[in-house]
Amino acid sequence: MAGPLVSALIAHLDSSFEGPNGDYPAIMEAIAGLTAQQALWRPSPERNSIWQIVDHLAASKEWQIEMLEKGQAESPPWTEPPGDEESWQALVIHLKDTHKRLKLALEHLKDEELLEYPVPELNRTLLELILSSGSAHEAHHGGQLSYLRGLREGKFQV
């Protein structure tokens, strides 16, 4: 069973991923009901689409899992989406799956491990790394997703 610090961290990650949290849009709330065509939209050619941000979030969760399990991970690449509905739905399922797998990886940690420095040259505890690459990162992108959706639909969601 996870200790209180690990449990609080998982609850925080769940809040930024699934909501509701009242402070900022959760990832799954921001993409609920979107089609592939809607997810592909971008406000200008040089900006990322909702699809690309969702793909980036799934890849970032994979990175976090690798860091927890192996102590190192490659930076996730940005990719161009295939664009079809089946691929979009598969990506949403993959995102949910990586969230579950990240939670499982975290549940195996002891609270004390969160206070260790896994990458000494970064001079940050595992807890700091997870908060910055996990929930803070998701809150940032949750805002982007909600904003992009609002731009596309001609309204803003809060």
Predicted segments with their positions:
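Acidic/histidine-rich alpha-helical segments that form the ligand environment
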Residues: G83-Y117, E128-H137
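Short, contiguous alpha-helical
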Residues: G3-V6, I10-I31, A36-E80, V119-V158
